[in-house]
């Protein structure tokens, strides 16, 4: 910052930092959230200097809150889902992405599940979400098919973890392990931003598009507030076009 401004540390002003912020955003293409983080660390540094009486005031405090762009987090498209399915090299991986999509569970919830938690006949299961709040969720026929195939291949018993590592001694899969597996799957399928939470967003969007009331989607996802559900769900462009054709 000092090199860019060509100033000593005790002469930097809030206006200087706003100029620095504008330059980094427009010329360097740095995201606003990244600049917010940088200014947070700079503010802590200047607070230290004020405490040590090396400078009189903290110029970062005069910058104010940066306006952050609201990033629209998109669900997987139908084509992307098919590419992901076609790129699975193992039954476990196919079972996992079908499970994530079908149930809409958080990845932390999935890693806590055991085989006995699945009521395969009813295609149901109970998960324990935030605050140990339980909710019931469901398996599609496709998810049931691949999950049964995967568990049979493993000869899995009731007390075993639902998803395990491929290497012996086949330990329970962790959140980082699942995230890594999905990143690799995304690379093979050429689908960017392939991570567990995106499957949750996708099923929520698809359920709404098919007519499920948003209050029911809220319960399905285990949200406390309806506002949270609204953030998770996006409307696909083709839906807008179809509605326009119908109502315009």
Where are each of the predicted segments found?
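Conserved catalytic core of the tyrosine transesterase superfamily
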Residues: 1-248
């Amino acid at each position: 910052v000092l090199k860019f401004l060509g100033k000593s540390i005790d002469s930097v002003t809030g206006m200087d930092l706003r100029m620095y912020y504008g330059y980094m955003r427009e010329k360097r293409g740095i995201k606003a959230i990244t600049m917010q983080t940088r200014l947070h660390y700079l503010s802590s540094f200047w607070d230290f200097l004020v405490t040590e009486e090396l400078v009189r005031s903290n110029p970062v405090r005069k910058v104010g809150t940066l306006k952050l762009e609201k990033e629209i987090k998109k669900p997987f498209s139908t084509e992307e889902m098919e590419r992901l399915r076609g790129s699975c090299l193992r039954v476990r991986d196919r079972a996992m992405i079908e499970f994530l999509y079908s149930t809409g569970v958080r990845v932390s919830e999935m890693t806590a599940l055991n085989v006995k938690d699945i009521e395969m006949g009813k295609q149901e299961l109970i998960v324990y979400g935030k605050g140990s709040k339980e909710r019931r969720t469901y398996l599609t026929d496709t998810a049931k098919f691949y999950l049964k195939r995967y568990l049979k291949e493993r000869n899995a018993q009731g007390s075993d973890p639902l998803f395990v590592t491929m290497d012996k001694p086949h330990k329970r899969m962790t959140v980082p392990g699942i995230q890594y597996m999905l990143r690799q799957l995304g690379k093979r399928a050429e689908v960017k931003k392939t991570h567990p939470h995106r499957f949750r967003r996708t099923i929520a969007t698809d359920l709404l598009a098919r007519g499920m009331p948003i209050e029911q989607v809220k319960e399905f996802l285990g949200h406390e507030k309806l506002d949270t559900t609204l953030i998770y769900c996006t409307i696909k462009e083709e839906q807008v076009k179809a509605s326009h054709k119908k109502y315009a």
